[in-house]
A protein has these predicted regions:
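Beta-strand/loop-rich accessory regions of lumenal/periplasmic or secreted enzymes
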Residues: 1-184
Length: 184
């Protein structure tokens, strides 16, 4: 059993055309610097197209985003990640206000008045530790990670450690957004 890193309250508001979601969390005393804070959605694999309004159109992180324009971008989910020899996180997009995943006939959208980061991937980040070498097998699902906060990449391997402003150090974190599922 894994002990939660945060005490949190998750609220849903059901409307005619959307579900409003708000999350408030307080970090537990023993937690230092988690890699990210957000929610994970598991969708059917057929949600394989992504359109978003945010930084892009390549992966970016809080400390690796400043040369990229905020605009509207479209990608295949399978093309939004980099396959490293040693499995690790990739494909994050920052400063987003909207992300939509599409199947042939449906759309799953997240819209927020506040910037968030997201990752759309056929891999579950929880599986990375199980593999010492490149992950060949995908989940058979589309995973959508919505992050209120995420840690920067840094350069500790060959330079200075990650600056504190790019770490998840907040004692309390809030995020809110609307979920919309509709026909395409």
């Amino acid at each position: 059993i894994v002990e939660p890193l945060y005490d949190f309250e998750l609220r849903y508001e059901f409307c005619a055309d959307a579900i409003g979601v708000s999350l408030t969390a307080k970090k537990r005393e023993w937690v230092t610097n988690p890699a990210r804070f957000g929610l994970k959605f598991t969708l059917q694999e057929k949600f394989d197209e992504c359109e978003y309004f945010g930084r892009g159109d390549v992966e970016n992180y809080p400390d690796r985003k400043f040369g990229l324009a905020v605009s509207r971008y479209k990608n295949k989910v399978s093309e939004m990640n980099f396959t490293y020899l040693k499995p690790q996180d990739s494909g994050e997009r920052c400063d987003c206000r909207e992300v939509s995943l599409f199947s042939r006939d449906k759309a799953f959208s997240v819209v927020s008045g506040k910037d968030f980061c997201f990752q759309a991937t056929p891999y579950d980040i929880g599986d990375y530790r199980k593999h010492d070498y490149m992950m060949e097998k995908k989940t058979g699902k589309t995973m959508l990670f919505l992050d209120a906060k995420t840690t920067g990449v840094g350069s500790a391997a060959c330079g200075a450690p990650l600056a504190a402003r790019y770490e998840v150090r907040d004692e309390e974190i809030e995020m809110s957004f609307d979920l919309v599922l509709c026909k395409r």
